[in-house]
């Protein structure tokens, strides 16, 4: 079984450009609506099963939380579910927003 990798925002920005790459944001819905990485999908306990069922388990999957701590547990969980290319973004959305403010969006999850 593979393990997830911890990466800085700079590497996440590059990985995000790969075809099929997915960014999942595990923060609460209100925080997600207030701001998230452009193109990110909100993931919570209610949506994770549907996400896993429809996911390409081999696609780069980047997990983001507030500061890069909770995302590590979520990334490990996804690896345990069969995902093979999982990353936890160090510094979370807070560091991403500070580093790449133009690469953020607002609005509720679809």
From Swiss-Prot:
The active site is at 65 (cysteine persulfide intermediate). Pfam families: Rhodanese. Gene3D superfamilies: Rhodanese-like domain. It catalyses: thiosulfate + hydrogen cyanide = thiocyanate + sulfite + 2 H(+); thiosulfate + [thioredoxin]-dithiol = [thioredoxin]-disulfide + hydrogen sulfide + sulfite + 2 H(+). GO terms for molecular function: thiosulfate-cyanide sulfurtransferase activity. GO terms for biological process: glycerol metabolic process. InterPro entries: GlpE_sulfurtransferase, Rhodanese-like_dom, Rhodanese-like_dom_sf, Thiosulf_sulfurTrfase. The keyword tRNA-binding does not apply. GO terms for cellular component: cytoplasm. It is an enzyme of class 2 (transferase). Keywords: Cytoplasm, Transferase. Transferase that catalyzes the transfer of sulfur from thiosulfate to thiophilic acceptors such as cyanide or dithiols. May function in a CysM-independent thiosulfate assimilation pathway by catalyzing the conversion of thiosulfate to sulfite, which can then be used for L-cysteine biosynthesis. Belongs to the GlpE family. This is Thiosulfate sulfurtransferase GlpE.
């Amino acid at each position: 079984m593979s393990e997830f990798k911890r990466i800085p925002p700079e590497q996440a920005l590059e990985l995000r450009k790969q075809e099929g790459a997915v960014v999942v944001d595990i923060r609460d819905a209100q925080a997600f609506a207030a701001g998230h990485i452009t193109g990110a999908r909100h993931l919570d306990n209610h949506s994770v099963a549907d996400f896993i069922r429809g996911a390409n388990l081999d696609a780069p999957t980047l997990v983001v939380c507030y500061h890069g701590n909770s995302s590590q547990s979520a990334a490990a969980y996804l690896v345990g579910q069969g995902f093979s290319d999982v990353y936890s973004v160090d510094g979370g959305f807070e560091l991403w927003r500070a580093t790449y403010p133009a690469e953020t969006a607002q609005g509720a999850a679809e």
